[in-house]
Amino acid sequence: VRGLLVVALSLCAAALLASGCGEAKQAAAASVAKPKPTCAYPAGWQKLANRIKAPVYCPGWLPDPLKGQIGGQWNNINSVSADRSYLESFVWQETGGGAAGGELHVNLRAYPGRTKIPTCRTGGSDSRNVPCYADPGRLISANGITTRLYTVNQDADAWHALLLWRRDGTLYTLSEHVAPPLTFDHVVRYLKQELGSLVLIKPAV
């Protein structure tokens, strides 16, 4: 009987040890940090940050085939204004015979030293001043950044879903065109993935 008791106690101890090891492994796995986003084309974004003397956000991911390379194949607008605000636009359009006419269009903007939403002109015979970004909706967060979703936007961001946030006295936006083959909900999912991929690049000078 005593021998059986010793065996039973040994088995219980082994089971408890195994359980503890399993829990330790689970805790260790849970504590492993997610990999940080990576800027695939840092040179152009560093040059932009140096030029405007303010931090910029480099996209680590854009929907295929877009690449977040300033001066690259898909970068159709690379514009910096006198007030240091900038627009970086990346676009792909399906063209040619039999094409369905799909489009992917992503804009990134910043307004250094300004947090107020800028004013735009509506254009046309009844042109008037309106906020460039309007009809704010829900909050969307990723990558430590909390943004507000805007759905009525002007100029290059017209017909785009747009994320807006502020950091250290600067207003930033990230927007994407709602156009085939993407639905509004699909665009919002893409925007959250793009937001999660952003890498902050500070000026070196």
Placement of each model-derived feature along the sequence:
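Extracytoplasmic/lumenal low-complexity Ser/Thr/Pro-rich segments of cell-envelope proteins
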Residues: 26-31
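Surface-exposed amphipathic alpha-helical segments
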Residues: 168-205
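C-terminal motif of bacterial Sec signal peptides marking the signal peptidase cleavage site
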Residues: 17-20
